[in-house]
């Protein structure tokens, strides 16, 4: 009796991943791009997170993203793409790229979310953002201004816009898997579902299905 129960349990557990995968339907929970967008993760699979620092939903999703990162497969790169869907979002996108240019993303990413989405601080131009970086102790204001006006940051902004346009991103947060599949929170139903669908699609790419 115990043996048969154990066999039944093993069979059930084997069916769980397939059943979960069957729940995620193309056109309902995610969409496939007719023309894939460029990935920038080398030999790794790419999960791109399109976000805006002032977005309450993106802010709420961050703990879910952080938890996912703890068990992220080694062959997957999480790429951050700051949204510039509106003109007033552009300074915040540029803040991310300036931070990346200075090598201080890890020291300012959460703090920018706290300030813009959490506290609704008025950080809408280079002077305010440079002062904020200095306030957080991650860079001198002059360093931020230099990075802000650099060719590298301008190029990153242009590529980010091209990525968003190519993926037909209309809101945040949005996930783009391997430049091919687009997942919105509205379609997925929750932040946790977004990442579950992303994991399903990453496995699909990994297996070549």
Predicted feature locations:
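C-terminal cap of thioredoxin/glutaredoxin-like
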Residues: 135-209
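A short alpha-helix capping/helix-coil boundary motif
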Residues: 45-46, 73-76, 107-111, 138-141, ...
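Sec/Tat-exported extracytoplasmic proteins
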Residues: 54, 69-72, 99-103, 112, ...
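Extracytoplasmic thiol/disulfide redox context detector
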Residues: 2-87, 161, 166, 202-209
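Solvent-exposed, acidic/flexible segments
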Residues: 43-44, 54-61, 85-92, 101-105, ...
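Structural microenvironment flanking redox-active thiols in thiol-disulfide oxidoreductases
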Residues: 73-102, 107-133
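Extracytoplasmic/secreted envelope proteins and their assembly/folding machinery
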Residues: 62-69, 92-96, 109, 126, ...
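Short, contiguous strand/loop micro-motifs
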Residues: 52, 82-83, 116-117, 147-148, ...
